Amino acid sequence: MSGELAGYRTIVTGGARGIGAVVARGFVEAGARALILDKRDDLGEALVASLPAHMARYRHCDVTDSAQVTAAFEEAARWLGGLDTLVHSAGMDKPGYTPEDLPEEVFDLVLSVNAKGTYLTNQAAFRLMKEKGGAIVNMGSLAGIRGMPDRPAYSAAKGAVLAWTRAVATAWGPYDVTVNAIAPTMGTDVAERYLAQLDSEERRQLEEDRKRLSPLGGRLGKVEQDLLPLVRLLAGPGGRYMTGQTFAVDGGRTMLGS
């Protein structure tokens, strides 16, 4: 599939690690030039160093800071000469709280990174896409679809991301800007951190539930194999007639309401 995004200009937030890093590498391998945004400068610089020269840049950016977001997108406009695609993958979670004991500061942090970060980056991307169109892909979550009692702030934040995606897809469609979301269940560093805060019995129960409730056996998806092709589809010419959708890449769990 190399070359399918040749000439495309993209920004990937949260692009130094996890899903974002795989997407950034996959886009460059498909011919796109990418500005990678993150706060993990060591990982971001290392990723860019591993990619073909002049195809990728890294910039430190806190997606909750409007000034940093504006400056990053202005750099993209200068370096790339415009913007065709935003893949907004930056996000975070603080699991392990019930709704009744969730601290206000945790709620504020999780909502800020996930929901406010989506608002700021999408808005900045639209300004660069308004004249010629483009594609925005936001990372949602199964938590935002069904709600998870041990991840109340994350559920609320990702629910907001999915609602925002539908709202702006409607508003920006006349400008030929598509906006879609993906709700993945992948084996990533976020998933590992979630599993790490569970005890052995909770992990065992989770694995049993996953196998019982997923038609594909409960395995976590592989980003390169199961998620990246969809992101490239939505970003490229094959995705121009899809907008306002949430694509669950989760082995069928959403289909079964699990």
Set out the residue ranges of the language-model regions.
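Residue(s) in the substrate-gating loop at a strand-loop-helix junction
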Residues: 141
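Active-site helix of classical SDR
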Residues: 122, 157, 165
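Substrate-binding pocket helix/loop in short-chain dehydrogenase/reductase
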Residues: 97-99, 103-109, 210-211
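C-terminal helical subdomain
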Residues: 174, 181, 202-242, 249-251
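Canonical Rossmann dinucleotide-binding motif of NAD(H)/NADP(H)-dependent dehydrogenases/reductases
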Residues: 3-35
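Active-site-adjacent segment of SDR/Rossmann-fold oxidoreductases
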Residues: 146, 155, 167-177, 240
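Short C-terminal tail/terminal secondary-structure segment
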Residues: 2-4, 93-96, 146, 232, ...
